[in-house]
Structures are given as structure tokens and as C-alpha cells.
């Protein structure tokens, strides 16, 4: 972790070489202590954090709605900037610049380190993904969500997408 990496290997070796063996055995890493200190939150902070997470999910829900997305018209950048403006209107800040991208059957929307998506316009049948977080009082959210843009005459996502989501969630549950 970047917060607990202050002692370089050279310095560590120098300290260890200058200490008698009986003291060398007492040297332990403080990394977990530093991480636990940063992770420690008061009950008020946890209440605020839960509210912050709820706000984050509500912003994503609205961003992925027909209020913001018009298939064939709205771009991924339109959604990104709508999210940023929404956060600003609430007096909050984004923790990092949001990412919105699309995935299409038979096509990939993988992008390079420049973050530039190959697809701009969100169409019916697209799977829209976002990575989005807000910050408040040193508390940060980091949420990723998916949404399916219904095709004409569809009332719900196709069965294959529901099954894929279920499998993904099952793996996620197994790993947490």
C-alpha cells in the first residue's frame, strides 16, 4: 500500500545491519497498522458513508435512465458530463473522472490507457458500463454498474444477459 511504504529496502537493510540480533527479531512491519489506521472510521463517518454510497447509486440509476440516455443520440461523454454536473449540483465532487463505455454483441469497446472509447453513441441493445465515485469529507465511493438499453419491443433484458449477470454475481459472491 502506498501509505505504508516509507522505508526503502536499502534503509531497512542499513537499520537491520546496525542492530544487534536480539533487537532485529523485534522489528516487524507496520504496514497493517498503517492500513488499519486509515481504515478506521467513526460511527458518524459510517453513517455518512452509507448515505454517500446511496447517493452514488442514485446518480448512476438516473444517468442510466431514459431521462439522460436517448438511444441513437446520447454519447458516453454526454453521460459522463451529466454525472459530473449532477455531483456538482449536489455540492459534492467526483473522486475521479467517471468512465462510461458500451459493449455490443460481436464488438468490443476496449480502450487504451488514454481512456478514449471506440464507441461514442449509446444504442438500443448496448450494455452500458460505468466506473464512478464521489468524495465527501475524506470518504470516497467507487462503484461500477451495468445497464442494458432495451431494444424496440423489449420489456426486459435478454435471457442470456440475465444468466451472464447471475454467473458473474455468483463468482463475485464466491470471492468475497
Task: Outline where the language-model segments fall.
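Active-site neighborhoods and metal-handling regions in enzymes and metal-associated proteins
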Residues: 1-176
